[in-house]
Regions:
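Hydrophobic "anchor" residues on beta-strands that sit immediately upstream
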Residues: 131
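The Walker A/P-loop phosphate-binding site
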Residues: 2-109, 117-126
Length: 135
């Protein structure tokens, strides 16, 4: 005999207007972008999901930009396109190169304001850029 919760679960799942799926549905598994750091890839199930928003959060000088360079390096190794939106105006081409990034193949935007940053990111995503970094 089904419980009320089980009945509700089935009813909601079958309602096509809601577009629900089961949380362990294989269709929800995404391709990933590797960090290129085996230990980090291991704990993140292979990196960050492609075509999804991912926030890397941490204190000042904690390695956030470095992790983003490693993700971008992985994208470049697969001949993907990188868009880097530098809101901090801290782009350092020499340091990025030392981290493994081919800066000759990075689309760089230093936006004038938040709207400019947003419009650049939206255009990049719409055109099919493989990774967008907002730094």
């Amino acid at each position: 005999m089904k419980t009320n919760a089980e009945d509700l679960f089935e009813t909601l799942l079958q309602d096509k207007n809601l577009g629900l799926s089961i949380g362990n549905d294989e269709a929800l598994e995404y391709d990933r972008i590797s960090f290129g750091i085996p230990q980090l890839d291991n704990i993140t199930n292979g990196g960050i999901p492609k075509k999804r928003f991912t926030l890397i959060y941490g204190g000042w000088s904690s390695g956030k930009s470095y992790l983003c360079t490693k993700l971008c390096e992985s994208v470049q190794k697969e001949n993907g396109t990188v868009l880097w939106v530098d809101t901090e105006q801290s782009w350092d081409s020499e340091w990025m190169t030392q981290c493994g990034l081919d800066t000759n193949k990075v689309l760089l935007k230093i936006p004038e304001n938040a709207e400019d940053a947003y419009n650049t990111m939206a255009a990049g995503m719409e055109k099919g850029v493989d990774i967008v970094v907002l730094d």
